[in-house]
Every structure is written in C-alpha cells, then in structure tokens.
Amino acid sequence: MEGVTVVSFFLLFIATAMAAKSTVSFRDGMLPNGDFELGPKPSDMKGTEILNKLAIPNWEVTGFVEYIKSGHKQGDMLLVVPAGKFAVRLGNEASIKQRLKVVKGMYYSLTFSAARTCAQDERLNISVAPDSGVIPIQTVYSSSGWDLYAWAFQAESDVAEVVIHNPGVEEDPACGPLIDGVAMRSLYPPRPTNKNILKNGGFEEGPLVLPGSTTGVLIPPFIEDDHSPLPGWMVESLKAVKYVDVEHFSVPQGRRAIELVAGKESAIAQVVRTVIGKTYVLSFAVGDANNACKGSMVVEAFAGKDTLKVPYESKGTGGFKRASIRFVAVSTRSRIMFYSTFYAMRSDDFSSLCGPVIDDVKLISVRKP
C-alpha cells in the first residue's frame, strides 16, 4: 500500500511538473518562441507540413500547419518572412496555441504579423476564452505583403490560452495565412481627468510595437469585441487604423499617434459623457508620419452634431498643425469621431496605404463666451 502511495505521489509530481512546463509566465514582449525560429525536428515534418502537434517548441498546433522558411516558393510566388528566417502557415481550420500565466482581470493586447498567400477573402479568428474576434486580412496595407495586427482581451483566470485559428475553407487546403512575430503586452486603460474628458487622448496606451518594426500596428474594426487594443477608442469603420510610434514615424505629441490609412473607411471614435446645453472644445493635432505620404489631406472631426474639416498639405517628411471645434452638447453622451476624407498611397512605393496622423486629442468643458 505504501508503494502504491509513493508511485501515486511520483505520478502526481510528474503531471504537475509537465503542466507547469507547458504554461509560461508572461512578460511584455515576444511570446516564448513567438518568432518561430525554434522549429520542428526533421522527423516531425513531411515536406513543410508539421506532423507532431507539439513539434514547435512552446506551441501546440492543430490541423494542417506548415513550417515555412523565408524564400520558400508557392508556385510562382516567393514567400518572404518579415523577421528572422521562419514563420508558420495555417491551412483550413488549422490553429496554433500557447498557454501563458497572466493576471486575472488584467487587460492584454496581442500583436502579430500576418500575410495572406492566396487571393481568397482570408481572415483569422483570435481567441482567449471567453473573448474572441475575427480579423480580416484581405486588405494588404503595406508593400511587403506583411502587416502587424493587434487584438485585446481581459484575462478571466490566471492562465490564458492564446489561439490563432484560420476558419477558412479554401479549395487548396494549404492555402492560408502566414503568421509570425507573436507578442503581447499588458494594458492599463487610462481614465478621464480634469484636463481631458477623453480617455487616452494622446494614444500613449496601446498595443506593443515590435522593436525593429517599421510598418506600425493595425488596429482592425472591433465592432463586436468587448475590448480594444487602443483603450478608450473604438474603430468604427470597414478598415483598420494604424498605431504608429516615435521610434519609426513622426509623431506630433508624446510617443504614439494614430494614422488614418483608408480614407472614410478608416475611423476611430469615443463616446463621452456630456451635460446637455454645456459648451465643449475639442482640440487635436493633424500631421503626417514622415513616411512619404504626400499630398492634400483632409481630416474630418465630429463632435456631437458638429463637424470640422481640417485640410493639411503633406510633404511626407513630418509636421503637423493644430485645430479645434467648439460645440454645445445636445445629449448626455456625445460621440467624438475622426476619419480621413481621401485615400492616399506612399510616394516611395505607390502600394502602401497611408494617410494623415491625429494626436493629442483633448476635450474640455468651457464657459460660454
């Protein structure tokens, strides 16, 4: 009987150790092997297909998942990896997942690179139970074919299982999106202050921008999602907005800003509490990101029922101007929204979508003149 007890204890110890090993404590930055540079053994692969679900260190794969080396050819198309030498491709109904130790109740933003490899309307399902969201990746915003995306969730327990899933059903089962550079950071949603009724008006709180990334991070439409990777703000449009940083772009104020990259299809909004009959002033900066986005631009700002069009002549080398709009609240809740009137393309490659930058957005109540 004593021997059985010892064996049972030993098996329990082994199971606990294995469980602990499969769940990694999270720190802001790249997930363990989030760049997929540690790959499967040759015995765990058939061509590019991964045969063993635990073949990629720190990850578990399900379905038809391929391990792709930069320079791999798909027919006449050359597959290029954005950083490092390797990425994974998710076939029909395939997924990758990783378990992380997190703080229950904390908000997190996931950042990852994705590229479509087929002409079909590709999308990704990102989930950390019970939160999930579908991210369309059909629109290619950069000339490289790779775009960085962000998605946010609130941890419901002290363990988060991050799942990236391809829900597509294509004619070619190997025809699916490439994934690379999976990273995450904690979010600390700011609150309104006596100097700004808006939350996160300077866009300083947002998704992780990977070091060395020069494209910015796309924040897709999150109409159905509970949490935004840009705390305080909603993306109320068909296309994404771009989160840019001072390390790689020109930013009017602080270290972060938003680039409106898809004309009227690229809009951000925030609903704030207001007092009916009270006067408010919305002020903000409009500029360009120093990314060769040249030409005549117009940002349209909406405050309650009032509208302001702000023209900006961009040389594509950085710069900004300030604007403001005064309005009287007609409701206890007022919507603040921005979008770009026109589409624009970078003048250095004529294939990357770009647009005006907005930053330093402030809303204050004022006395009537």
Swiss-Prot record:
Subcellular location: Secreted, Cell wall
Swiss-Prot/TrEMBL induction comment: Induced by L-galactono-1,4-lactone (L-GalL), the terminal precursor for ascorbic acid (AsA) biosynthesis in the Smirnoff-Wheeler pathway. Accumulates during seed imbibition.
Keywords, sorted A to Z: Cell wall, Glycoprotein, Secreted, Signal
Glycosylation sites recorded in the entry for this protein: N125
InterPro entries associated with the record: DGR2-like_dom, Galactose-bd-like_sf, Pectin_Meth_Modulator
Top-level taxon: Eukaryota
GO biological process, any: root morphogenesis
GO cellular component, one term: plastid
Main location group: secreted
Tissue expression as described in the entry: Expressed in roots, seedlings and leaves.
Pfam family, one: DUF642
Disruption phenotype: Reduced roots and rosettes development.
Signal peptide: 1-19
PANTHER family for the chain: OS02G0527500 PROTEIN-RELATED, PROTEIN DUF642 L-GALACTONO-1,4-LACTONE-RESPONSIVE GENE 2
Function: Involved in the regulation of testa rupture during seed germination. Required during roots and rosettes development.
Protein name (database record): Protein DUF642 L-GALACTONO-1,4-LACTONE-RESPONSIVE GENE 2
Annotated organism of origin: Arabidopsis thaliana
